[in-house]
Amino acid sequence: RNNITPKIHFAITIVVFIVISTFTTKLSAQEPVVQWDQTIGTTSNDNLVQVNLTSDGGFILGGYTSGGISGDKTEANMGGTDMWVVKLDALGNIQWQNSIGTSSSDNLVDIVQTVDGGFLLGCTSSTGISGDKTEAAIGLSDFWIIKLNASGVIMWQNTIGGTGNDNLTDIEPVPSGGFLLS
């Protein structure tokens, strides 16, 4: 009798486990529903670096491309690769876009939304004044920080660095409303 009781208890435990597992699997196995999908690009090499939710429920896409006017891109290439920023609404429709660059390669590193609804973006630049860049190079490479308004228009820009290599890796908002650059 002692040998039967543990076996029955074990069998009941297994049955209960299977029932719970089956019920849980059915609840969690529901396929997610695709709300929308969107392919955005040029006929050249496009690199997406960031996708962020915006305060209006849309999305900001940031990356870089060697493509000129083609596909979805409406602005010419300035040289090498240019930063490419695309604002989407909540349904994935393009609201605006901006291609920002110099005569050399400009690969977007980060983009964050600002409290006024605009955007702060940046890259590492080794180029002087050319294309959209209005400030001279300081060192071998510098932070190039650009402020866009909520419509994607450049409001201001700043070149930051020393005499050597300064490579931007991150833009982080801080509670005071400013930003940390690293």
Predicted regions and their residues:
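Bacterial Sec-dependent N-terminal signal peptides
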Residues: R1-P32
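A sequence-level/structural motif corresponding to short, flexible coil/turn segments enriched
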Residues: K26-S182
